[in-house]
C-alpha cells in the first residue's frame, strides 16, 4: 500500500508518497510530518520479517526518512500512538511472552527513546495519555476498567473507573475534560461520562438492539457526534452535549421508506440467553416480525463470528430487511471465542478450547428448533472469516441440522493454515499444528478433514475472493472440491469466487453492495423454501 497526503485547507495533493506500507497506521507530529511502521521484507508474510519505525518530514522524499526504532536484533513487533506531545511505542517479542514500553517526547527533536515500566500486577492495555499520566485498562479484569499512573512515578496506580460486572467496556474516548466509556450488556449499548477523577457525570443509552459509534469529539464545546444504527434501522446521527445532556439530530442520511414497503415498527428485536451443553449462558439476538407464529416453519438464518475476542454488533443490512419482511427469522449467537462477555469468554473459545465455539453455535441451532422458531429443514447458517470456520465445522459435524450453509472467506484446513499468508499470526488463537496436543485438537474439527464419504451435506455456497491475503482462497477451493467429489453428495455445492477482491470483498459501489446482498439472500431464501 501507499500513504499519500492532501492539504485539506487548499484542497491540493502533496507530492509526498510513502511506499511499501502494510499493517501500519500513520501518526502526525503536529503538521510537520508523520511516523509510520515499515516491514524489512517486501514479502509481508515472511516469517523472518522485522519492523522499523520511521519519521517522514513533509516535503522530503521517502529515502531521507529518519529511522527511529528498529526490531531487527530481537525480531519483535510493536504498536505506536501519538498523544499530545508524546509518542508511545509498545514492543512485543515473537513468542508474545515479553513486552517493553517506550515513549518519545516530541518536543525533543532528536526523538530520543525512553523506556518506562508498567506497575507490577497490571496486565497493561493502553487507552490514552494526558500530560505525564498514562490511562490504561487492566486486562486481568474480565469486563474492563480504567486506571492511570504517572510515567515519572509508575509505582503508584490510581483506579479511576472500576469494572462493572456483566457490562463489557467496549471502547473509551477522552476529551480535555471527560472520559467517555462505551458499555454493552445483553443487547443494550450505552455511554457513561466521567470526570478524570472518576466522578460519574451522565449516561446516554441507545434503544434495545441498537449500536452506535462515536464519530467525532469536540473539545471546545464538549459535544459528541454519534451515529446510531441497528439491523433494521439505518444511520441516525445525533449531537450529544456532555455538559448539558442535550441531544439533537444533526444530520440524517436515512430516508424513511413508505410504511407499506418497510413498516419498521413491526419488527421485534430481542436478546435472550440459551444454555450451552456445558451450562454456559450464551447470548443470542433474534429478529422477526411481530406476531410471528412459533410453529417450526419459519425460514431462519443463524450467524456467528466467535473469534479473536471480537465484539460483534448489529449493522444495517437492507438485504436482511427483505428477508425479515418476507417472514424470515434472523439470529446472531455471541458464542465463545468472541469478546461479547469479556476476556474469559474469548479465552474459553480459543486454542485447545476452540471446540466450545462450535458447540455453542450448534447449541444455538438446536435452541431455535426446540423453541419452534424453525426446523432443520428451514434453517440456514452463515458466517465470514472466523465465522466461516464456525459454519464449516457445524455443517461437517452436524449435517443433519441444517438445510443451507453459506461459509464466507473461511479457514477450512486447520492443519496447514499457518503455512499461508498471515496464518502464522493466528497460532495463538487456533493452536500450533507442530504441537502434538494442539495438532490433535485441530484435526478433531478441521472442516476439510472432517468431510466423510457416504454423507450428503447441506446445500452449500462457499464464497471466497481471489486476492484474499488474510484467508487465501485455497482453503475454499480445497473445501469445495472435496465436498463435490463424492458420490453421496446429492445437495448442490457451489463455489463463488469474487474477482479483484480481498478478504472483505470488493464493495466499491452501492450497486455492487446491493448485488452481493441480493445474491446471498436470494440463495438462502430459495433453498430454504424448496
Protein language model features and the residues they cover:
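Long hydrophobic segments that form regular secondary structure
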Residues: 71-145, 149-154, 163, 178, ...
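Active-site-proximal cap/loop segments of hydrolase catalytic domains
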Residues: 332-530
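A flexible loop/linker signature enriched in serine peptidases of the S9 family
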Residues: 1-2, 16-22, 38-52, 61, ...
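Non-catalytic accessory segments flanking enzyme active sites
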Residues: 1, 76-93, 98-103, 111-129, ...
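A conserved hydrophobic secondary-structure block that centers on an alpha-helix together
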Residues: 1-25, 30-31
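Beta-strand initiation motifs
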Residues: 10-15, 60-66, 108-113, 152-158, ...
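Beta-propeller blade signature
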Residues: 4-8, 50-59, 101-106, 147-151, ...
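Cap/lid segment of the alpha/beta-hydrolase catalytic domain
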Residues: 1, 9-12, 243-246, 251-377, ...
Amino acid at each position: 500500500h501507499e500513504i499519500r497526503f492532501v492539504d485539506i485547507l487548499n484542497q491540493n495533493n502533496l507530492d509526498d508518497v510513502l511506499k511499501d506500507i502494510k499493517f501500519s497506521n500513520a501518526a502526525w507530529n503536529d503538521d510537520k510530518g508523520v511516523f509510520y511502521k515499515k516491514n524489512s521484507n517486501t514479502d509481508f508474510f515472511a516469517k523472518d520479517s522485522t519492523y522499523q519505525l520511521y519519521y517522514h518530514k513533509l516535503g522530503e522524499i521517502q529515502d531521507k526518512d529518519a529511522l527511529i526504532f528498529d526490531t531487527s536484533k530481537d525480531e519483535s513487533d510493536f504498536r505506536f500512538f501519538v498523544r499530545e506531545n508524546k509518542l508511545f511505542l509498545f514492543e512485543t517479542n515473537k513468542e508474545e511472552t515479553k513486552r517493553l514500553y517506550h515513549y518519545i517526547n516530541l518536543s525533543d527533536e532528536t526523538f530520543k527513546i525512553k523506556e518506562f515500566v508498567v506497575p507490577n500486577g497490571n496486565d497493561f492495555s493502553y487507552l490514552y495519555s494526558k500530560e505525564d499520566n498514562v490511562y490504561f485498562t487492566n486486562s486481568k479484569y474480565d469486563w474492563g476498567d480504567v486506571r492511570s499512573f504517572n510515567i515519572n512515578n509508575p509505582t503508584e496506580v490510581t483506579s479511576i473507573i472500576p469494572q462493572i460486572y456483566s457490562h463489557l467496556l467496549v471502547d473509551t474516548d477522552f476529551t480535555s475534560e471527560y472520559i467517555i466509556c462505551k458499555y454493552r450488556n445483553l443487547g443494550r449499548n450505552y455511554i457513561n461520562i466521567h470526570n478524570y477523577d472518576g466522578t460519574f457525570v451522565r449516561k446516554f443509552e441507545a434503544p434495545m438492539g441498537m449500536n452506535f459509534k462515536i464519530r467525532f469529539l469536540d473539545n471546545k464545546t464538549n459535544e459528541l457526534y454519534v451515529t446510531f444504527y441497528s439491523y433494521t434501522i439505518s444511520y441516525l446521527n445525533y449531537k450529544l452535549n456532555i455538559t448539558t445532556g442535550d441531544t439533537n439530530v444533526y444530520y440524517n442520511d436515512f430516508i424513511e421508506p413508505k410504511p407499506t414497503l418497510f413498516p419498521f415498527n413491526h419488527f421485534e428485536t430481542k436478546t435472550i440467553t440459551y444454555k450451552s451443553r456445558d451450562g454456559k449462558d450464551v447470548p443470542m439476538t433474534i429478529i422477526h416480525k411481530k406476531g410471528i407464529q412459533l410453529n417450526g416453519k419459519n425460514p431462519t438464518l443463524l450467524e456467528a463470528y466467535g473469534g479473536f475476542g471480537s465484539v460483534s454488533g448489529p449493522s444495517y443490512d437492507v438485504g436482511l430487511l427483505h428477508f425479515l419482511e418476507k417472514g424470515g427469522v434472523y439470529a446472531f449467537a455471541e458464542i465463545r471465542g468472541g469478546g461479547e462477555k469479556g476476556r474469559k469468554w474469548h479465552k474459553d473459545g480459543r486454542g485447545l478450547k476452540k471446540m466450545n465455539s462450535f458447540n455453542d453455535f450448534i447449541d444455538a441451532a438446536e435452541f431455535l428448533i426446540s423453541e419452534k422458531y424453525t426446523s432443520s429443514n428451514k434453517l440456514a447458517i452463515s458466517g465470514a472469516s472466523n465465522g466461516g470456520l464456525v459454519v464449516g465445522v457445524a455443517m461437517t459435524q452436524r449435517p443433519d441440522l441444517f438445510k443451507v450453509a453459506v461459509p464466507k472467506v473461511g479457514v477450512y484446513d486447520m492443519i496447514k493454515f499457518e503455512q499461508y499468508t498471515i496464518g502464522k499470526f493466528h497460532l495463538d488463537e487456533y493452536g500450533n499444528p507442530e504441537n502434538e496436543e494442539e495438532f490433535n485438537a485441530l484435526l478433531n474439527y478441521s472442516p476439510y478433514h472432517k468431510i466423510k464419504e457416504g454423507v450428503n451435506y447441506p446445500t452449500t455456497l462457499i464464497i471466497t475472493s481471489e486476492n484474499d491475503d488474510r484467508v487465501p482462497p485455497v482453503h475454499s477451493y480445497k473445501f469445495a472440491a472435496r465436498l463435490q467429489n463424492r458420490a453421496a453428495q446429492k445437495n448442490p455445492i457451489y463455489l463463488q469466487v469474487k474477482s479483484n477482491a480481498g478478504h472483505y470483498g470488493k464493495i466499491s459501489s452501492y450497486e455492487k453492495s446491493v448485488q452481493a446482498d441480493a445474491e446471498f439472500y436470494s440463495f438462502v431464501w430459495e433453498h430454504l423454501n424448496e
